[in-house]
């Protein structure tokens, strides 16, 4: 959140044996931040740390008329763009990297039904979003399992589904509701091959008092998956 925290985190990474590369001033300017650094986690995912975002406070004007996306709480608190799921074949070391060094907390541990040996750690930052990051204990050819963006109403979700259908997008999962974060969502295949979860109604947690849970079911209902090139 500030320069001191940025420096402390970079120093902790170096102390733990990770190589931290400082970003150039030009690249920081392109990212609209004061400074940033890159590091590779134990599973080979490159991440960036930064501080000092530049803001112009221009409101979002969606070309599709979306009223807004859920990125804050109580009008001021920052919850980020949504969430990101990364592949983590070196699972234990990668989970430790994000919890012990980066400082995230475990929200939920999921053992997906029908996927022998699979495990997902859902992690929260210092804000009420149920998870901002999740780690899946398997490699992924694109380096990203999926991203999630959240809209403010069920009608916005429905209109987005209509636009996706009209555009011929592949639905990787039908409408459903997850168990752990209560998100009502669909999964779409983006042109680059990354899955995008488009959701509504995710729960909020207290990151200071939340106690991690263990789930053996992924969904309350729905979310019938259909992967391209995979026959039933």
What label would you give each PLM region?
Residues 1-46, 88-92, 149-196, 200-207, ...:
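Vicinal oxygen chelate
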Residues 17, 21-35, 51-72:
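Asp-box/WD-like beta-propeller blade repeats and closely related beta-sheet repeat scaffolds
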Residues 27-28, 86-130:
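Core segments of cupin and vicinal oxygen chelate
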Residues 33, 80, 117, 129, ...:
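Exposed loop/turn and edge beta-strand positions of beta-sandwich/beta-sheet ligand-binding modules
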Residues 48-50, 96-99, 107, 122-125, ...:
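A structural feature that tracks compact, well-ordered secondary-structure segments
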Residues 52-55, 114, 202-204:
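A short acidic/small-residue loop/turn micro-motif
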Residues 56, 60-92, 105, 144-149, ...:
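N-terminal beta-strand motif that seeds the catalytic metal site of vicinal oxygen chelate
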Residues 141:
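Long C-terminal interaction/binding lobes of large macromolecular proteins
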């Amino acid at each position: 959140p500030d320069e001191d925290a940025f420096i402390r985190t970079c120093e902790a990474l170096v102390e733990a044996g990770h190589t931290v590369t400082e970003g150039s001033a030009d690249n920081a300017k392109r990212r609209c931040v004061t400074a940033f650094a890159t590091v590779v986690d134990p599973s080979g995912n490159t991440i960036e740390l930064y501080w000092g975002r530049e803001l112009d406070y221009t409101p979002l004007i969606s070309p599709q008329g979306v009223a807004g996306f859920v990125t804050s709480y109580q009008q001021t608190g920052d919850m980020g763009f949504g969430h990101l799921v990364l592949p983590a074949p070196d699972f234990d070391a990668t989970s430790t990297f994000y919890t012990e060094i980066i400082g995230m907390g475990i929200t939920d541990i999921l053992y997906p039904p029908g996927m022998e040996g699979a495990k997902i750690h859902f992690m929260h930052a210092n804000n009420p979003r149920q998870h901002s990051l999740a780690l899946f204990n398997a490699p992924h050819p694109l380096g990203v399992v999926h991203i999630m963006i959240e809209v403010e109403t069920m009608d916005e979700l429905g209109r987005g589904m209509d636009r996706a259908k009209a555009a011929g997008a592949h639905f990787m999962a039908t409408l459903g509701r997850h168990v752990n974060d209560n998100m009502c969502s669909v999964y779409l295949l983006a042109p680059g091959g990354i899955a995008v979860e488009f959701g509504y109604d995710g729960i909020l947690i207290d990151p200071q008092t939340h106690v991690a849970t263990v789930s053996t079911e992924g969904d309350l209902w729905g979310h019938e998956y259909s992967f391209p090139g995979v026959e039933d």
